[in-house]
Amino acid sequence: MFPYHFIGYWGDKRKEFLSQRRKGAKEEGAEGKFVWDVVYVGCESVPVLAKNTIAAISAGGVFDNFDVWVRLESNKLILGRDAFGRVSLFWTQQGGVVWFASQLQLLLEVIEKPEVNIYGLYGYSCFSYVPNPLTSVNEVFSVCAGTEVIWKDINYPQFRNIYQWCESKEHIQDENIAVSQLQVLLKNAVEKQVADLQDEPVGVFLSGGLDSSIVAALLVEAGVKVRAYTLDFGNVGIPEYPYAEQVAEFLNIPLVKVDASPKNIKNALVPTVKALDLPFGDGVTVPLYLLNQVASQETQIIFNGEGGDQLFAGWTNKPLIAAGIYQAEHPNQEEGFIQQYLRTFHRFWGYEKRVYQPEIYAQIQGLNAQDWLLNALDASFCPSLLHRLRRASLMLKGAQNIHPRATALGFAHGLGVRSPFCDLLLAEWTFQLSGELCLHGACEKYILKRAVENWLPSEIVWRQKRGMGVPLTSWCLNDFWHDIGNWLNPGILSSDNYFFPDLASQIVTGELGGTIQGRRIGESLWLLIMWQLWYSHVFGSKLGKKSFYHPFILPRWLWKKYQQFQT
């Protein structure tokens, strides 16, 4: 019966919609003047829940620790989501009813004429995910991580923070004490997540990076049968799988290399978009879909190393720390620290006038993308810069992007998803660390590396690591060149009336300007591709008439010759 999704309502009148349209275990009831109804999609029987809880989901299938929940309490409806944001929870109000669901697609069925949320689209173009509490659909909202949304009556919800990431007043300075405490916390985090396992094998996504390697090592130490899965992008870029092979050999566990060839990526593109539910524009999502697909043939539980960068200030923090120090010493500089932070997403912020058609551009004029970052970067919760960046990373890139998409992709393949770094005791402990223990000179994640240096090969622990090298630009400019003419066709973009019709060709020629060069070309195209496929395959928009006047209709070499001739 696991994993499953749910959709339900709470209001002053009974709805027959669920019985007519949705198959699954069903439960209904009434409290005071309100009635409620929930269907558990994918369940043959109603899951066992705590008193007053009418719906809940655990990402890993650990049923004493739910990631989202729906409760009834004294004529109140309460929707809640844990601080890590591992499972999504959505709601909308239609007449005298509050609808809620764990998938956006389920709520699309109850909205008579759904419309794209332009603010959500703009946020997506800035971050590669839709910033909470917005979604990509008008009148549908997401419950923010660490928040409960409460209705005492139908019309006026209240929002209550149930958790804040806060810097500790006392800092751990002693390296040996920190190492000893961290080793215990890491082992305990994994032991809690394997306590319910019997003799079945589990999978671990092993990139060869530090975080996933630590998880694999701890699973082996806990006596669990482990199978590792890693991606093989072929001869493009710098391969990471040799590091995964080294770790697997060291731990004596089987390793499955998953073929992430352009052909397999293309075949999995639309299924990935549907599985994600919301638009996510990072290039890693389709390769992760392939990992889940292969793993699901051999296991029901998958472990990952997601969250390690957020907890221990991974490599992406270095330029931000430099920017923060510079800003403190030069407070009158035109571009502030939050703007610098916004630039680290490397998306379309700052390019709005060249990206959006005039009607959309006019609608977003009153928006400031920095507003979506202010709470996460609030210095009152974390006075020191490094902890403030960690708080922001947990709340933004973690809870709104990395964790919910990992769970969605696992659920689509019937997998429970477990992330040992999403452990509250471990996370709270990291806010006690002195800055020097996180970033020691130029060495990021220093204290984590010190804690595990005897658990893994030295070259794995101490090597410089970057994010997963998905060869998006190579794919887009070579293997998917003609496909871009379909996915981002000027005729379709023109009829959609969001983006300029020639945006894709502007990107590949470098004419969009600024920093959209090299790897950013592929990232920018992928962001648009994922939105367009979501718009047609999830939102259900009909495609406009295609144009044949675009460079992607020609072989790329011939188009480049044509360009030279034109100049």
Whereabouts are the PLM-identified features?
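Cysteine-centered catalytic environments shared across enzyme families
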Residues: M1-F17, R21, G29-V270, A275-L276, ...
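A mobile, often basic/glycine-rich helix-loop segment
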Residues: F312-Q339
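Short secondary-structure boundary/capping segments
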Residues: T272-K274, T316-A323, K545-K546
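Active-site nucleotide-sugar/metal-binding loop of Leloir-type enzymes
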Residues: Q293-S296
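Short acidic/histidine-rich active-site segments
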Residues: T299-W315, R463
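Adenosyl-5′-phosphate
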Residues: M1-D12, N138-C144, V284, I301-F303, ...
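Short catalytic/ligand-binding loop motif for oxyanion handling, primarily in non-cytosolic enzymes
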Residues: I78, V87-F90, L108, G237, ...
